[in-house]
């Protein structure tokens, strides 16, 4: 017989730097999960992606055990890293903060493809370009 799911918790945590402090502790503590076990396993799995924020979906079962799935980093985080930005533009329509070649957008789209609701790489690229536009990043040919 399969375990019964008690809750699904979604968090965005820096790779390799999860701690029992907020937001991880309170989110898992209220479901009775062993927080240190999650933190240790998450940090081991994401150590190679240091510096990125990794979304994680934690499934908590009624017997207080858990499983989790890590997703790809948010498009905005990948775009900021590719453009070398600390923060995006506060006024994306007026103030452009960077230019990014279409080849970089394609790389990001290929990385994000498993988590995007897109049928083709071109559709995924359009989604990433839309995110870039809303951040004040211009997409240039190249």
Curated annotation (Swiss-Prot):
The keyword Ribonucleoprotein applies. GO terms for cellular component: cytosolic large ribosomal subunit. Pfam families: Ribosomal_L11 (PF00298), Ribosomal_L11_N (PF03946). Disulfide bonds: none annotated. InterPro entries: Ribosomal_uL11 (IPR000911), Ribosomal_uL11_bac-typ (IPR006519), Ribosomal_uL11_C (IPR020783), Ribosomal_uL11_C_sf (IPR036769), Ribosomal_uL11_CS (IPR020785), Ribosomal_uL11_N (IPR020784), Ribosomal_uL11_N_sf (IPR036796). Part of the ribosomal stalk of the 50S ribosomal subunit. Interacts with L10 and the large rRNA to form the base of the stalk. L10 forms an elongated spine to which L12 dimers bind in a sequential fashion forming a multimeric L10(L12)X complex. This is Large ribosomal subunit protein uL11. It comes from Pelotomaculum thermopropionicum (strain DSM 13744 / JCM 10971 / SI). The lineage of its organism: Bacteria, Bacillati, Bacillota, Clostridia, Eubacteriales.
């Amino acid at each position: 017989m399969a375990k019964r799911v008690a809750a699904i918790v979604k968090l965005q945590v820096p790779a390799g730097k999860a701690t029992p402090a907020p937001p991880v502790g309170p989110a898992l503590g209220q479901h009775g999960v062993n927080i240190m076990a999650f933190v240790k396993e998450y940090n081991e799995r994401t150590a190679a992606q240091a510096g990125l924020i990794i979304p994680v979906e934690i499934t908590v079962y009624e017997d207080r055990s858990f499983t989790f799935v890590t997703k790809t980093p948010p498009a905005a985080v990948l775009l900021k890293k590719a453009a070398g930005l600390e923060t995006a533009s506060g006024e994306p329509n007026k103030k452009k903060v960077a230019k990014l070649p279409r080849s970089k957008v394609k790389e990001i789209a290929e990385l994000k493809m498993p988590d995007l609701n897109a049928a083709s790489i071109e559709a995924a690229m359009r989604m990433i370009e839309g995110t870039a536009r809303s951040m004040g990043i211009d997409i240039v040919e190249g």
